[in-house]
Amino acid sequence: MVEFSLKKARNNWKHVKKSASSPAKQKTPPSPAKPKQKTKKNPYSDLKDPATSYTLPTINARERSRVATSMQRRLSIHNTNYAPPTLDYSMPLPDMPNMIVPNDNVDSSHNNSSFTTENESVSSKGPSNSLNLSTADLSLNDSSYNKVPARSAMRNTVNPSGSNDPFNNSTSLRKMLANPHFNAKDFVHDKLGNASAITIDKFTSNLTDLSIQVQEEVKLNINKSYNEIMTVNNDLNVAMLELKRVRANINDLNEVLDQCTKIAEKRLQLQDQIDQERQGNFNNVESHSNSPALLPPLKAGQNGNLMRRDRSSVLILEKFWDTELDQLFKNVEGAQKFINSTKGRHILMNSANWMELNTTTGKPLQMVQIFILNDLVLIADKSRDKQNDFIVSQCYPLKDVTVTQEEFSTKRLLFKFSNSNSSLYECRDADECSRLLDVIRKAKDDLCDIFHVEEENSKRIRESFRYLQSTQQTPGRENNRSPNKNKRRSMGGSITPGRNVTGAMDQYLLQNLTLSMHSRPRSRDMSSTAQRLKFLDEGVEEIDIELARLRFESAVETLLDIESQLEDLSERISDEELMLLNLISLKIEQRREAISSKLSQSILSSNEIVHLKSGTENMIKLGLPEQALDLFLQNRSNFIQDLILQIGSVDNPTNYLTQLAVIRFQTIKKTVEDFQDIFKELGAKISSILVDWCSDEVDNHFKLIDKQLLNDEMLSPGSIKSSRKQIDGLKAVGLDFVYKLDEFIKKNSDKIR
């Protein structure tokens, strides 16, 4: 209110000063029409005596109401639900003895300007202090839990902390609110019923500060709890990993113990057998005490029953090798690109503390580690990114590496590779260098032995394969049973060659060759092509199983699938794998012949049209459409012959000839329809075979009638009409044999009546 009055007085004073200091306006004569108005005397115009300038100007009711409304708004900020009471602003304010300003702060000798300066200095210090206090409250240290907000701290500086007044001290207010017997309604009625606006403002501010402090404490407690939970969670994860590692180690230990137990049991069994055998030999010696000499007891290796080897130790050794390779893959970056975990591959030696030298100057280049495998040499150098890991520098097959020791130094080895590159390495220990050289020599000797065994096995396989190729005959075009080539050829003909070699012996040789190919020792990795060939060779047995169960469709599909894969592999196969490819191709040809032979028998003996169509379609899938059509037509010819034989006696010639015409020509018509259904894509190429067969069947019909006329029997016009009717029915499928009937009538016109 004081500030508002001072502002208004200052504006009035400026207006008076401006009017007094403008001489131009005083020169203007006054208007005669309007009377001269008296200007109000400004109480602040004469400020010579500061003691008389303390009197405040009066404020009207409207401005006083505006000031009161502003004060209500300031008080309503602290409490949103605050409703200001209806007050009479004409009444004087009550006395406030608690708010007496100390005498130290009042100086009657100060003038108006010094009073304003002092207020400005106090207001300028206030925000900085509150800023420092609020910054200190926002720190997240553990010691800041009990700190109060800035406003409470500022208020506590005015009121001592030892005071128990809840209106001025937030600590006492907090204790009061924490009391379980605290009643808010009673407190408001007793303490705040007759309180002043300033007291209510202080109490509201204390409540707000206390609420902020509690919220900050809650946030800090939540943050602390979250950090503790995360710490416990991390510890649990570490413990879980350790438990998994311990569990894996326990499982490995159990496996090793089980294997050791099995090995011990087998060794005890073998030892018992050896002891029993020795005891039996000792009894035999005692029974033959009259013999001139005593025979030594049989050893374990001399008994055929004891020649069985215990391979459990080999399995343990292979697992140990795999573990070493896995460790190599973890420690050496890029090792998996050059080394595969193939069965039998293992590490012979791992030598560290080697230094690669310049072959020309002999200066050291980098630290390396050399790994000698049973068929590879891997050299790894230190990785620049990681201090403890290695990265692959060179990797070559052992047979392509030549290692020599320098004459003037026992610690240096010169490695010469197949690509005409060479590297010089030096070791700190001369014994380590000699041991590495011995391991390489032994590994190369083992590779030479394996290579010789492979050469002998390959030579034997080539000779056997060459023998099979010379004795094996592939079905050719002459086996096609087309009516144009051989109409009455026996369907049970054999395709065995002229030499005295049976199919059983060929099969026996093929089995031995396959076993020899798969049992070959391999010094290098089995390529993907070789693995596919082995898989295809196993698929040949599936054909035999399906064929034995008379599942011709599955057998044909498997055969065609293997043939397509062999054709794909033949383009990128090596010379070493070409022999196995030819061997599998030879076995596939045998299975093809077996399938075609059994399909031929099935087609000829089938009386159901469904099985007949299925067998014919399978023959077409095998690439034998002409042979399939020939078998199909021969089956239909046999079917016509069987139906004719079932007619019986020929007491009524007219009825007999009518039945002959119906059987033959209706079967021909049905056969043409089945041909169009089975041979959809190949009908245009082999339709001539069908037309020839139909023509032959029509000729056979008239030949059979001629045999009936040999007994001087006469033909009735009814039988001729029935034959003409059936022949005309063939026109529906595109066949017209009316001219054959006309020729028959002309030839036997004298016997028709």
Curated annotation (Swiss-Prot):
Residues 7-18 have a biased composition (Basic residues). GO terms for cellular component: cellular bud neck; cellular bud tip; exocyst; incipient cellular bud site; mating projection tip; prospore membrane; transport vesicle. Involved in the secretory pathway as part of the exocyst complex which tethers secretory vesicles to the sites of exocytosis. Plays a role in both the assembly of the exocyst and the polarization of this complex to specific sites of the plasma membrane for exocytosis and to the budding site. Also involved in assembly of the spliceosome. It comes from the Eukaryota. Residues 103-114 have a biased composition (Low complexity). GO terms for biological process: exocyst assembly; exocyst localization; exocytosis; Golgi to plasma membrane transport; protein localization; protein transport; spliceosomal complex assembly; vesicle docking involved in exocytosis. Keywords: Coiled coil, Cytoplasmic vesicle, Exocytosis, Isopeptide bond, Phosphoprotein, Protein transport, Transport, Ubl conjugation. Component of the exocyst complex composed of SEC3, SEC5, SEC6, SEC8, SEC10, SEC15, EXO70 and EXO84. Also interacts with SNP1. It is found in: Cytoplasmic vesicle, Secretory vesicle; Bud; Bud neck. This is Exocyst complex component EXO84. Belongs to the EXO84 family. It comes from Saccharomyces cerevisiae (strain ATCC 204508 / S288c). Residues 1-69, 101-136, 467-498 are annotated as: Disordered.
